[in-house]
């Protein structure tokens, strides 16, 4: 059997994702589509609107054959580390291809640029540092430095282009046999916050925003299973998961933390801990808080990730230890259909990473220890006894079928 | 002017406390009654039902002339340290007497027993250790060891007797000129949980319990000002402060803490951190949680204090540094009437501790740093923008008149 990998967040799974899965299958004629999916928190440092289990169910219904977890130490990360983790898992699962959606739409410039980045790594790093020293934020500095070392075809200010570039770069660096592919995204702007009226495709950001107001508005932009899963979740748990819900916990935590302890938290650098401590006293919402902390130097995304690490109490030291090898240390399926199951059956005897269906066995793995803390922080907003039940779900849920 | 000191929690101020203030004034014929009052959390490790400012207002209306804060590092402590802190503040304020309520009711056995404890300190400590090693909890071990070194008149299993004993002992140890006095308590049982029907005096525990159900039931057991203050507080803040309200925060915190970090927390000893970590997963309420953690060795009170220290993130190291000298480092009035103001005016030029009316100036004091964290944890349960307002109150509230 032949497998293609995709890297996803499905926050939540919508018609654009459905299209991506269908196009991936068509373009690669793979037998099995494997999605590596962020767990409880996303790359941009936000709690996923519903837990990984619900999102995995949506993915299965949307045509994915196997959903595996991208654990927190890789998921809540810069694009570079996010890609390293995802590629290492797809590689461990013997995917022949990795197919990502991008603004650009053809693979050649990704390969060229990635090669340039790998072979002129030090030169590029040096340039990035120079720009950052000038007060330019990391994303911009990265693009400018890329231009300086001779690149001029790929627009890396586009969020999916930059992610795609990092997948290809990770493939090269990990000497993986995975062949990268790309398909053009049909949602023009990732950050769109209004729902389009003439189409049935909208960004996940706009869908999440509209879910806060009314479920009905989003029905046409998501497959039926997504709609139903979201409804059931809210009916059972009485909430979505969004930053505002976690704000009381973040505030409580920041208020009772010493500045020295904030400095230990992942991604905290250069005195931002003092800004955080000061702004939290007056902030009455997460949005207010981040607006007060924001400077030119820190992107909103970076600040959101820092807040996520504070919430989950994940330190620089822990993260560094966990991702030292730049690879995942286990593969954890969250959901699979018959095809997914058959594929796993076929490859598992050759796999060099443990295939984990019961998280209990991973208790002492540094990556899993972080993943577990993140799950525990994630369910903290649920009322009892739902919170306790959700906690036990992390250990007790076998991969969904 | 002549001042008498009392040590209180007023959680909340009730008719029994009113009687105590009146009797104290009568017995000592002091011009000024000074109450040292626990701040946000009590000696038994519970959040006070309303903030210190509200409780100070009740005290003033109940006849106290000056209310000063017993800061967290002394307030949330064993009886011994609680007494050391309180006596040091009353001593700094030149109180001539300290008058406490006790089950026993006459002062001689307190003085005798305290002297015994001071002069046979090492012998007593050694005996206590022996009993604790046998698995007996600290309170019992303390009483048994006291009996062993020759004491036989004071029943130290009574909570107010033991507190009183520690006041007298602290007076001796601190070589203070304060003269101790006691009056018999008229609430027979401190831990009573039902309201008496034939009287207008009930324990604070039973009053707190009944407040959860209905305000009306408690009206006859508290002065009018207490009743009104409680009503206004609940009307404004939509809540009382009790452990169950803080349980989501405690649970979140314990779940995301490493075992090593729990070991650093004040009063955590002998592997209790593993019991805490294990029990929290299944616990759906604070009461369930503590019941699951409880062993013979740990009293309920001790466990509650540990939970309070976890909630406020107060470590052994911080506490040790703060109370190294066994004395308070400042005197902070929370409320005063004209008599209280006149008294302060008279004594302040002779005081050796700073008199703090704006907490901002104490920012770098180790005791105040802990007090501040406790305030911040205490207000975390309030909805926004009330939480932010309450935080600013800590700095901005001048002593009430």
Curated annotation (Swiss-Prot), chains A, B:
Cellular component annotations (GO), alphabetically ordered: cytoplasm
Binding site for ATP: 7-20, 101, 160, 185-186
Any GO MF annotation of the entry: tRNA binding
Superkingdom classification of source: Bacteria
Protein location: Cytoplasm
Pfam families: HIGH_NTase1 (PF05636)
EC number assigned by the record: 6.3.4.-
Principal place of residence: cytoplasm
GO biological process, one term: tRNA modification
Catalytic activity: cytidine(34) in elongator tRNA(Met) + acetate + ATP = N(4)-acetylcytidine(34) in elongator tRNA(Met) + AMP + diphosphate
Keywords: ATP-binding, Cytoplasm, Ligase, Nucleotide-binding, RNA-binding, tRNA processing, tRNA-binding
Family: Belongs to the TmcAL family.
Function (record text): Catalyzes the formation of N(4)-acetylcytidine (ac(4)C) at the wobble position of elongator tRNA(Met), using acetate and ATP as substrates. First activates an acetate ion to form acetyladenylate (Ac-AMP) and then transfers the acetyl group to tRNA to form ac(4)C34.
HAMAP family linked: TmcAL
Name of the protein in question: tRNA(Met) cytidine acetate ligase
Organism: Anoxybacillus flavithermus (strain DSM 21510 / WK1)
């Amino acid at each position: 059997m032949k497998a293609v990998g995709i890297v996803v967040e499905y926050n939540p799974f919508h018609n654009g994702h459905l299209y991506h899965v269908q196009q991936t299958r068509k373009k690669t004629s793979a037998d099995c589509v494997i999605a590596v999916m962020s767990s409880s928190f996303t790359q941009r440092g936000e709690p996923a609107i519903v837990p990984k289990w619900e999102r995995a169910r949506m993915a299965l219904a949307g045509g994915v054959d196997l959903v595996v977890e991208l654990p927190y130490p890789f998921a809540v990360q810069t694009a570079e580390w996010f890609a390293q983790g995802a590629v290492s898992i797809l590689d461990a699962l013997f995917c022949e291809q990795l197919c990502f959606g991008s603004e650009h739409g053809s693979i050649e410039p990704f390969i060229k640029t990635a090669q340039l980045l790998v072979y002129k790594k030090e030169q590029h790093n040096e340039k990035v540092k120079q720009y950052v020293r000038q007060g330019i934020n990391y994303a911009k500095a990265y693009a400018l430095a890329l231009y300086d070392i001779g690149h001029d075809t790929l627009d890396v200010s586009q969020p999916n282009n930059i992610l795609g570039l990092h997948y290809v770069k990770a493939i090269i660096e990990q000497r993986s046999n995975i062949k990268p592919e790309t398909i053009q995204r049909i949602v023009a702007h990732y950050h769109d916050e209004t729902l389009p009226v003439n189409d049935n495709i909208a960004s996940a950001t706009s869908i999440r925003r509209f879910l806060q107001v009314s479920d009905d508005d989003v029905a046409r932009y998501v497959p039926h299973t997504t709609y139903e899963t979201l409804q059931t979740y809210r009916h059972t748990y009485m909430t979505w998961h969004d930053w505002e819900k976690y704000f009381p916990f973040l505030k409580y935590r920041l208020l009772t933390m010493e500045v020295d302890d904030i400095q230990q938290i992942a991604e905290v650098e250069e005195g931002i801990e003092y800004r955080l401590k000061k702004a939290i006293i007056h902030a009455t919402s997460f949005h207010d808080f981040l607006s007060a902390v924001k400077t030119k130097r820190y992107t909103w995304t970076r600040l959101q990730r820092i807040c996520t690490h504070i919430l989950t109490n994940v330190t620089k030291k822990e993260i560094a230890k966990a991702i030292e090898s730049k690879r995942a240390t286990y593969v954890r399926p969250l959901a699979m259909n018959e095809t997914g199951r058959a594929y796993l059956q076929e490859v598992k005897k050759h796999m060099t990473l443990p295939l984990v269906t019961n998280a209990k066995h991973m208790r002492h793995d540094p990556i899993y220890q972080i993943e577990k803390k993140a799950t525990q922080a994630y369910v903290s907003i649920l009322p009892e006894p739902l919170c306790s039940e959700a906690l036990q779900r992390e250990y007790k849920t076998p991969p969904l079928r």
